[in-house]
């Protein structure tokens, strides 16, 4: 089987996630991803069965309810700005 996920892709994803992986970790992740994809390929071999769904979504009507006003919602916020929650900068 050819590698469905290669080491370069794993390094790229790790870089995006700001994870440091050494060569051994990358090889391990490549092997694990290959194993996972093989299991999904096996699922394609399972025959489909015509069956009625056992679960049904239960929908309820939307109901208007009282909510917090802006001052109450911001009352416990550690920091606010211009009537909104303020969080730390993310770079």
From Swiss-Prot:
GO biological process: glutaminyl-tRNAGln biosynthesis via transamidation; regulation of translational fidelity; translation
A UniProt-annotated Pfam family: GatC
Catalytic reaction annotation: L-glutamyl-tRNA(Gln) + L-glutamine + ATP + H2O = L-glutaminyl-tRNA(Gln) + L-glutamate + ADP + phosphate + H(+); L-aspartyl-tRNA(Asn) + L-glutamine + ATP + H2O = L-asparaginyl-tRNA(Asn) + L-glutamate + ADP + phosphate + 2 H(+)
Region ranges (Disordered): 68-91
Domain of life, per lineage: Archaea
InterPro entries: Asp/Glu-ADT_sf_sub_c (IPR036113), GatC (IPR003837)
UniProt keyword terms in alphabetical order: ATP-binding, Ligase, Nucleotide-binding, Protein biosynthesis
Gene3D superfamilies cross-referenced by the UniProt entry: Glu-tRNAGln amidotransferase C subunit, N-terminal domain (1.10.20.60)
The keyword tRNA processing is annotated on this UniProt entry: no
Its EC number(s): 6.3.5.-
Assembly: Heterotrimer of A, B and C subunits.
Similarity annotation: Belongs to the GatC family.
PANTHER family per UniProt: GLUTAMYL-TRNA(GLN) AMIDOTRANSFERASE SUBUNIT C, MITOCHONDRIAL
Protein role: Allows the formation of correctly charged Asn-tRNA(Asn) or Gln-tRNA(Gln) through the transamidation of misacylated Asp-tRNA(Asn) or Glu-tRNA(Gln) in organisms which lack either or both of asparaginyl-tRNA or glutaminyl-tRNA synthetases. The reaction takes place in the presence of glutamine and ATP through an activated phospho-Asp-tRNA(Asn) or phospho-Glu-tRNA(Gln).
Name the record gives this protein: Glutamyl-tRNA(Gln) amidotransferase subunit C
UniProt organism field: Halobacterium salinarum (strain ATCC 700922 / JCM 11081 / NRC-1)
Encoding gene (name): gatC
